[in-house]
Design a protein with these regions (language model features):
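HTH-adjacent hinge/linker in prokaryotic transcriptional regulators
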Residues: 3-7, 18-21, 42-127
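Periplasmic-binding protein-like
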Residues: 99, 151-159, 223-226, 280-291, ...
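Short beta-strand elements in bilobed, periplasmic/extracellular small-molecule ligand-binding domains
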Residues: 121-131, 240-268
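Hydrophobic alpha-helical segments within soluble ligand-binding/sensing domains
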Residues: 187-189, 196-224, 234, 265-275, ...
Length: 375
């Protein structure tokens, strides 16, 4: 029987080396063997250092080099037979490859990626980024591409319009064959992706903090103006909770969007009209505007229509990329973007490096934004 075993294990090894990582259940079906038989093969191959095991997945072992610069045996430096890579190996340049899927490296996500890269490289690993440009299904395509190039784990920001998956959306994220951390995304209880680690800013707290500050200055009717982004729902939740908790008067309702998506120009015009009407007819004296770039564009147009900032309308922006460069320096809530990337990367590397972190409880981390006051 041994020749059959050898041939099967050789086939397993070839598939893992070609694909980078393979789910054990899928591999058993592909080879037409029972999961029990395949697990015995995997245990033997992992003990020889030919493959690594983790989270129901087997991955290839990257070949290293010995002190003389020669190719080391496949198992050399690979860590334990169960696929755990010692933390010391990471700090010494153990060669783990982290894949990161984000919509873009512009604006918000630029700092997230920079934070992740700094944390990954500080531990001797490498980061490879895949961009989705918010294209449908491109997040899954990029995740598959990174896995095919040998990524040992994924930092994942799916294209979920509301920041969390809609009905029937995103189930695939929970079936990925490697350790995965959601970055700046959330999944509701009961959704498969809720079982994943995740790291994000607490945008609801950031919005509430802005409302608290404005209320402390004496404002009783505060508006929220935000275009639709993955952050918007959490801003609305925090804003609404703070208005209720502080007993503030409700601002005029945001106008309904009507049928079909609006262009950026139409959205901007609607926001301008809303704020002008809220001040002149609705008794609003302060506003939280998302984002700071929108606020900087809105303020001169508000002033052109007779709404003075800050005399008639005090403004705090959500995000702090350019708020300090406005003609009227704007106070701003700054999400901890770089820290989110770094904490997500560290959490993923802790999972991959083994020890108690590998099988420990999943973590949902929310980092509090900072409020910067400018006079």
């Amino acid at each position: 029987m041994r020749p059959h075993v050898d041939r099967r294990q050789a086939q397993v090894l070839a598939l893992v080396r070609a694909r980078g990582s393979v789910r054990v259940a899928e591999l058993a079906r592909e080879l037409g063997v029972s999961p029990v038989t395949l697990r015995r093969d995997i245990e033997a191959m992992a003990a020889r250092g030919e493959i690594r095991r983790m989270h129901g997945v087997i991955t290839r072992v990257e070949r290293g080099r010995d002190a003389a610069g020669r190719d080391a045996p496949p198992g050399a430096g690979a860590g334990a037979a169960d696929g755990r890579v010692p933390g010391g190996a990471l700090r010494d340049g153990g060669g783990l490859l982290v894949g990161m899927v984000v919509p873009t490296t512009d604006y918000y996500y630029g700092d997230v990626v920079r934070g992740a890269r700094a944390a990954v490289e500080a531990r001797g690993a490498r980061l490879r980024v895949g961009l989705t440009r918010y294209l449908p299904d491109e997040d899954r395509t990029q995740a598959d591409r990174l896995l095919s190039t040998g990524a040992h784990g994924l930092l994942l920001t799916p294209n979920w319009e509301a920041g969390s998956p809609g009905p029937g959306e995103g189930d695939w994220t929970a079936g990925l064959p490697v350790a995965t951390v959601l970055v700046e995304r959330w999944a509701p209880p009961g959704h498969p992706a809720a079982e994943l680690d995740r790291v994000a800013c607490d945008h609801a707290h950031g919005a509430a903090r802005a409302v608290q500050h404005l209320a402390g200055l004496g404002h009783r009717r505060i508006a929220l103006a935000s275009r639709t982004t993955p952050t918007t729902e959490r801003l609305r939740a925090g804003y609404g909770a703070a208005v209720a908790a502080l007993g503030l008067e409700p601002a005029p309702a945001w106008p309904p969007t009507g049928h079909g998506p609006l262009s950026d120009a139409d959205l901007f015009a609607r926001t301008l009209d809303y704020l002008c009407d809220a001040v002149t007819a609705g008794g609003v004296t302060a506003a939280l505007i998302h984002s700071d770039t929108d606020a900087i564009m809105l303020i001169p147009r508000l002033q052109a229509r007779g709404v003075r900032v800050p005399e008639d309308l005090a403004v705090i922006t959500y995000d702090d990329e350019v708020a300090g460069m406005a003609d009227v320096p704007l106070s701003a809530v700054a999400p901890a973007k770089r820290e989110v990337g770094a904490r997500a990367a560290d959490l993923l590397l802790d999972r991959l490096s083994g020890g108690s972190a590998l099988d420990g409880p999943r973590q949902h981390l929310e980092l509090l934004p900072r409020l910067t006051i400018r006079q």
